[in-house]
């Protein structure tokens, strides 16, 4: 399956099973520098923040499980929650490809917050 079709299928699967505001592809595939054995690095911005820590940590794993099972890509897909990874990885993610955007203010607020954190912590330090 071609890269574009795989991405479209991933987006469709995520939207059919989870409530998300944005989906990102990052890493080597987002930069067009993938190798045949490169994994798919995907980040999701869930629509609702999960207050329960256990459930919050499990959510990206559940997305990963659906993608791996439905696409038959076991150990080839890695999914993270944009809001709970470290700021440097957050910046890497939003500098990748946003492959889905629900066009709600939440997406821009989170992205601007990430940029502000990076500027504060790394640029103007």
What is the meaning of each model-derived region?
Residues 38-40:
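Short, conserved active-site loops that position catalytic residues or coordinate cofactors/metal ions
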Residues 1-22, 31-36, 49-125:
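Catalytic core of pol beta-like nucleotidyltransferases
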Residues 43-47:
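Short hydrophobic/aromatic beta-strand micro-patches
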Residues 28:
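Conserved H-loop
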């Amino acid at each position: 399956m071609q890269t574009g079709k795989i991405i479209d299928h991933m987006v469709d699967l995520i939207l059919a099973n989870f409530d998300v505001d944005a989906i990102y592809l990052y890493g080597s595939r987002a930069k067009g520098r993938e190798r045949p054995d490169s994994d798919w690095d995907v980040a999701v911005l869930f629509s609702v923040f999960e207050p329960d820590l256990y459930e919050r940590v499990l959510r990206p794993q559940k997305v990963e499980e659906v993608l791996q099972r439905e696409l038959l890509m076991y150990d080839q897909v890695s999914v993270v929650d944009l809001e709970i990874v470290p700021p440097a990885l957050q910046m890497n993610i939003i500098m990748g490809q946003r492959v889905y955007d629900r066009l709600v203010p939440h997406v821009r607020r989170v992205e601007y917050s990430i940029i502000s954190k990076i500027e504060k912590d790394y640029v103007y330090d």
